[in-house]
Amino acid sequence: MEYGHFNDAEREYVITNPRTPVKWVNYVGTLAFGGFIDHTGGSQLCKGDPALNRITKYVPQMPSSDFKGETAYARVRKPGSSAESAEIVSPYWVPCLGKYDSFECRVGMYYTRWITKMAGLTFDVLAFVPRGSSELVRRYRVTNSDNVPLAVDLVPVVEFSHFDALKQLTNADWVPQTMTSTGVSLKDGRTAIAAYAFMKRDFAVNVVVANRPALSYETDRKRFLGDNEYGTWREPLSLRNERLSSKDAVRGDTIAALQLDLGVIKPGETVSVITQLLQTGGISSVEGACGKWRTEAEVDAAFADLKAFWDRYLSVVKVETPDAAFNSMLNLHNPRQCYTTKTWSRYLSLYQLGYGSDRGIGYRDSSQDTMGVIAQIPDEARELMEKLLSVQSRDGSAYHQFNPLTMVAGRGDSMEYEDRPHYYSDDALWIVLAVSAYLKETGDYAFLDKTIPFYEKDKEDRPLESGTVWEHMARAVAFTHGNTGKHGLPLLGFADWNDTVNLPAGAESLFTANLYGWALAELSELCAFRGDAANKALFDGWYAEMKRRVNETAWDGEWFVRYFDDKGAPVGSSKNEFGKLWLNGQSWAVLSGFAFNGQTSGGRARAAMDAVKKHLATEKGIKLSWPGYNGFDPQKGGVTTYPPGAKENGGIFLHPNPWAIIAETMLGDGDQAFDYYTRINPAAKNDSVDEYECEPYCYAQNILSNEHPNFGLGRNSWLSGTSSWVYQASTKYILGIRPEHGGLRLDPCVPKSWDGFTVERVCRGATYRVSVKNPKGASKGIAKIVVDGKEIAGNLIPWFSDGTHTVEATLG
């Protein structure tokens, strides 16, 4: 079944059937104030911290038909008739679930718009968080599309969460005793609803207000639903009364409902209402907080400002290729998702629920996320990298995650196991790749000299030591160099990128070995550019040493092993019953360069990726490993808690798929690289969504593989490193436009069937208009480049500081 379609001209995905397999969401605002809105109007919002400053109550585990966080009701009747005779509908369809004539939910660039027709009315609702503000604005335009006058009340409703999101679910005594929701009469005659937990009354109050006076209001869920809450969200019994109670709630399950009398709307007439949900500093500041977003002009200006931001953001990379789904994702939806993962890390989504103050921002997650936004928002990327570097330990390792408000860091799940190491071996290395990408993109080499403290502090909370960004990077690789095991390979620690494989202390990681190799290569390249011969020699030596160890110890005959356990036995070997072959063991041996052994193609690199194609590749994506473990094994850890074919246990874990795509481009196989891309492109799944279920406009984290009965089912969309890496694989390796220290490298690897493509790329103050022709049906290899009318040698375009420059290239 088709649930919607892409409208690239408007930068929207248009949902036309509200009965999607799961909730499809869109993000609004930022971590400072924002969250997500689902396609039927529900919202999950917070200010600053979803764990400790939650605003709306949204429980994803409840059925899709349930009200979640926010909605609105329209009470429609003939003029002069009673409320009991009215038809009650929702512009969002949920929770009323009544008959509708048409439904559109337009998922845009950090806004969502609904255009629905029902009960003789056309609703046009726009929801977004204005840039720089701390309010969710919803503008309702209600048009009488019938041929008779209709009397209409609009009743927007918000259900509040306790600020402590976890306690909202786990403490049914303390939470309701602390909650208050009260009507506040404003000087201009409007009514605002102020809701708060008692202990936050003087510094964190949630407010719901409209731009017109309310006829009545409600603050208590029990009264609103009616009949001791045996009334339902589908048809609250209080809406059968002429007015709501206008009583305050001094405990219980608090809501805000405003009865807004739109009067009698004539045929063809439109009435507008603007509502806002915000958080202000205390009950005394409610009046002052309700002065904005009163007029259509204000909303229009704020919406234009939001769209202008996305105009700028999306203008940095614009592509046109023979593949429409590739164009749609790369020009619109993939960049938006990269922005979202950079903003939210893995903090708050339909699946990452944001409970518990120890989750916060992941070190490895956000290091990779920055790489997907450096081109568009380099200053914000740098700011995040500085925060990440500040939670690096003096020994070069990194804390696994941190709270962005308090900057308190933790070691993650490793602290739950007394007998396992309390660090993740890959964490600290990712920042080397991120900083290197930032330097190549911006040329901001002064960043290397910025002093940033390490995490450890004295009793007065002062840093024990600080170092330059360069010193932080050097310590990251030095930590790996100094922590190796029986085979001379990096110790696994509690885990590497694959959090769920938790082998006993002493295990070694081939993933970390290869990531270390890539990090060393980046540092060596940087040293060469800066003329630092001594450090270049050091890093080159470490690289050669690790490359030798990997090839001497980890080649299994047809592929590379993935781990060595604490006893020195291989994991990811043909000799194993389960987990014989692991994707990351192969792709990363190519990415690091370790698999080449002096060759640019073929050899172990080609053999390893051939094993991936033979054993791991499915038509819906590449599996993380094969075959899946069939039973819990405490020596392996969390990977064996999943059934075969799910998540890390032989599932199609999407994050590593772009690493395989990059590996294939490095081997020169553009057809295979793009084939792998297409298999996981959600836009290409639009016509098979009943199987896939997740949003077709963003990447999921995982898809159940062919080892699972529900092969093809996707989950955990939006907040996934898949987004950043697919974006990099697409722009830097398939299209082949890579910023380097000395210039802009043009090195495409595309399907042979493509006759060419164009890219407009903004970098370091200049615009490059790149046109690539492919007359001979090649995948890789530049035969000729002409820059501003002059042919250049090689494929490295020199940097320009300004202006627009034409680049004409021919493959062959």
Descriptions of predicted regions:
Residues 47, 51-121, 614-615, 643-649, ...:
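Non-catalytic C-terminal accessory modules of carbohydrate-active enzymes
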Residues 63, 112-114, 125-239, 289-316:
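Polysaccharide-binding surfaces and accessory modules of carbohydrate-active proteins
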Residues 361-366, 370-381, 385-486, 509-513, ...:
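Aromatic-rich carbohydrate-recognition surfaces in CAZymes
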Residues 155-157, 171-174, 399-401, 515-637, ...:
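Catalytic cores of carbohydrate-active enzymes
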Residues 97-99, 321-332, 379, 383-397, ...:
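Active-site acid/base region of carbohydrate-active enzymes
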